[in-house]
Amino acid sequence: MIVVTTDFVPGYEIVETLGIVTGSIVNSKHLGKDIAAAFKTLAGGEIKSYTELLVESRNIALKRMIDEAEKLGADAVIGLRFGSSSVMQSAAEILAYGTAVKLRKLSE
């Protein structure tokens, strides 16, 4: 599966647009790690447990979006974007979205 942030795939022609595809996850950290993170904000610096959580969540959302595109028979997802929102005090949603398309390779 080709996934790009652009609205085109170099070397290919878009022959069919299949629609918007999304993948999302709502995730939160363990209460103990939340407390440790709160203390870390007082001192400043990176909160590694949250960085790791967001990287993992982004990867899961991306995989879910790709799975949805594959179910539609897509060759690629164009215009990939990520979004995030706070669902509650210690939980965040990560959303991956784009447009599923069918491609044809351009002759060289």
Swiss-Prot record:
<dbReference type="Pfam" id="PF01906">
    <property type="entry name" value="YbjQ_1"/>
</dbReference>
<comment type="similarity">
    <text>Belongs to the UPF0145 family.</text>
</comment>
<dbReference type="InterPro" id="IPR035439">
    <property type="entry name" value="UPF0145_dom_sf"/>
</dbReference>
<dbReference type="InterPro" id="IPR002765">
    <property type="entry name" value="UPF0145_YbjQ-like"/>
</dbReference>
<protein>
    <recommendedName>
        <fullName>UPF0145 protein Fnod_0426</fullName>
    </recommendedName>
</protein>
